[in-house]
A protein has these predicted regions:
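Conserved small-residue-rich
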Residues: 159-209
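N-terminal signal peptide c-region/cleavage motif recognized by signal peptidases
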Residues: 24-26
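Sequence/structural segment immediately N-terminal to covalent heme-attachment motifs in c-type
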Residues: 30-81, 157-179
Length: 238
């Protein structure tokens, strides 16, 4: 099915469900929109249900020869899980691009971010609906977490309370990830992921996993997610 047809179908669904979002209340709808935008920052094409891009994004710097295809169309691919781009975890490694992060847009006008998403560099106009871009803009301007408050950049260790995180994990996470973090089987052990890339884990614990039945903890204090991350780092890595 063509992307345009999928987008039209999604537009109808969004119109029908608009009243439900209003009835949910402005506060919860706001957190929900932020979490939606955060999941789209992660993997927008998975969230909106369109075919994943097959080409390499035209704006990926030629200096990066390690990444290609749909991975290069994800916001996080250049701007990072820590939202700091070249000044954060992506200063080195396979995702190094020299591109700046989005931290400077915290508190900015969402319309400015939408305009950037539509510009020639990003080229997302026509790839997603206006509401989708608005959700990303809401996350970028209103939903970024200062990850340096919860993760020590040098050691990659969460600064949360692992003992408290164990209690949260046992009541929120265990059914899907298992007591030892070894589920689902098609995912690397949670302990391994949490220790290798704590910024990704914090982003997903807060906002959820694109295309999966994983709810984010966005409506709760970010410290709860940091505590969960601290406990996850104690789980087996293999």
């Amino acid at each position: 099915m063509a992307v345009s047809k999928l987008l039209r179908r999604r537009y109808i669904v969004l119109v029908i469900s608009a009243s439900a979002l209003v009835l949910a209340g402005s506060a919860s709808a706001g957190e929900g929109k932020i979490a939606l935008g955060a999941k789209m920052y992660d993997k927008w094409f998975k969230v909106i249900g369109v075919p994943k891009p097959e080409d390499t994004h035209k704006s990926l710097p030629s200096s990066n020869s390690k990444k290609k295809g749909n991975a290069t169309h994800r916001c996080k691919a250049c701007h990072g899980w820590d939202y700091s781009g070249k000044d954060g975890a992506y200063a080195t490694g396979s995702y190094q691009t020299g591109i700046t992060g989005v931290r400077a847009f915290a508190g900015a006008n969402p319309a400015d971010v939408v305009a950037i998403l539509k510009d020639a560099t990003h080229g997302f106009e026509g790839a997603m609906l206006a509401g989708d871009m608005a959700a990303i803009a809401t996350f970028v301007t209103e939903g970024q977490v200062d990850m340096d408050k919860y993760i020590d950049r040098a050691s990659k260790k969460f600064t949360g309370d692992a003992a408290q995180g164990k209690e949260y994990y046992a009541t929120i996470c265990v059914n899907c990830h298992g007591a030892d973090g070894m589920l689902p089987k098609d995912m690397a052990p949670l302990g391994e992921v949490a220790n290798k890339n704590p910024w990704e884990v914090l982003h997903k614990v807060l906002n959820g996993q694109p295309g999966e039945n994983m709810s984010g903890l966005r409506a709760l204090p970010a410290q709860v997610a940091a505590d969960v991350g601290a406990y996850a780092q104690t789980l087996p890595t293999e």
